[in-house]
Amino acid sequence: MRAPGSGRLALPLLLLAVVALAEGDAKGLKEGETPGNFMEDEQWLSSISQYSGKIKHWNRFRDEVEDDYIKSWEDNQQGDEALDTTKDPCQKVKCSRHKVCVAQGYQRAMCISRKKLEHRIKQPSLKLHGGKDSVCKPCHMAQLASVCGSDGHTYSSVCKLEQQACLSSKQLAVRCEGPCPCPTEQSTASTTDSKSETCTGQDLADLGDRLRDWFQLLRENSKQNGSANSATNPAGLDKSLGASCKDSIGWMFSKLDTSGDLFLDQTELAAINLDKYEVCIRPFFNSCDTYKDGRVSTAEWCFCFWREKPPCLAELERTQIQEAAKKKPGVFIPSCDEDGYYRKMQCDQSRGDCWCVDQLGLELTGTRMHGTPDCDDIVGFSGDFGSGVGWEDEEEKETEEAGEEAEEEEGEAGEADDGGYIW
């Protein structure tokens, strides 16, 4: 027999079951795949949603490596939760239609294309799951330092670059530290462009005149602005500068010589920033450095702009211009002193010959030899610019010696008379 009132209880229970079933379907619809356009899936939404959880916009070109970095970052933020090694990390990961979820360790999961997966399965040495033998090693937050890869892309760390190389089966290397493009690429391109420009002999000859006119213009502008007398020249500058160098050329030297040592080094010469307009500016100043010591003295600076240069410096400039124009190796290069005149000894490095000259460069007969002649004994300098061999006249020498002997005899006779002999 049926208990009384059982039919009344069955109807409410049936209704409750129907309502629960409907709620379960609705919940399953929310948690499962969204019906309709598959592009509305969470996996295609931009990674901005992974930071805020609210802002979401369409972005089908997501970086797999960067997504992996974000997931690892979220996993690290959940450090309070105990690590559950029984759960598969791919349970909550949804991949696109042509990709498969692959677990790496207990907390990491990545979406890899089916073709790459099949390619890795064919290679027995590779393992898909994390471990000591895993090729695609995990990356940690402590290793973040952006680098530029050989493929032209910027990676958040070297580990990310190696991981991308592992995933894409490509050979990638670090081109430089920091984001792309590398600074060396830009500097190399500019250096190549500057080296492509060649300076002819006429260019070097005309550049000195243009610089002199430019210095004169700068000095006139400085006078008008009242700053010409603000910077006084060093005490030794006026003494070291020649008479023809105390105009705009000497004024420019005092402006450039910030150290006050009466020399212009490469840093001080770099203040004349005309490389963009004068491609021969550096070769010109290199030709001024006759000593090749990396700096330009006051004399070298003045001689660079002299219309009439001393003989040795003039020949040196002609030789350098010929080398720049024709590029002839083995050309004799004269050795000049600080005043622009020839040194006593000149040597041809290509032949190994050395000889003695005067200050005007005239070779003294019989002094050329293999080795180093003693030009100090051969050449006698008199005055500032005169030179010549110390020839002696034997007849005059004998006459002078005879006169000296007669004077000595007379002196001895006088001393004898003082003795007081009585005849």
Curated annotation (Swiss-Prot):
Location of the protein in the cell? Secreted, Extracellular space, Extracellular matrix
Q: What name does the UniProt record give this protein? A: Testican-2
- Under the cellular component aspect of Gene Ontology, which terms does the record hold? collagen-containing extracellular matrix; extracellular region
Q: Pfam families per the record?
A: Kazal_2, SPARC_Ca_bdg, Thyroglobulin_1
Glycans attached where?
A: 225, 382, 387
Changes after translation: O-glycosylated; contains chondroitin sulfate and heparan sulfate.
Q: Which residues does the UniProt record annotate as the domain Thyroglobulin type-1?
A: 309-375
Please report any disulfide bonds recorded for this protein chain, giving both cysteine positions. Answer: 90-101, 95-111, 136-166, 139-159, 148-180, 312-336, 347-354, 356-375
Main localization, broad class = secreted
Tissue expression profile of the protein: Brain specific.
**What does the record give under GO molecular function?**
calcium ion binding; extracellular matrix binding; glycosaminoglycan binding
Positions carrying Phosphoserine: 72
Function statement: May participate in diverse steps of neurogenesis. Binds calcium.
In this protein, which residues make up the domain named Kazal-like? 130-182
PANTHER family assigned to the protein according to its UniProt record, in alphabetical order: SPARC OSTEONECTIN, TESTICAN-2
Which residues constitute the signal peptide according to the record?
A: 1-22
**InterPro entries listed in its UniProt record:** EF-hand-dom_pair, Kazal_dom, Kazal_dom_sf, SPARC/Testican_Ca-bd-dom, Thyroglobulin_1, Thyroglobulin_1_sf
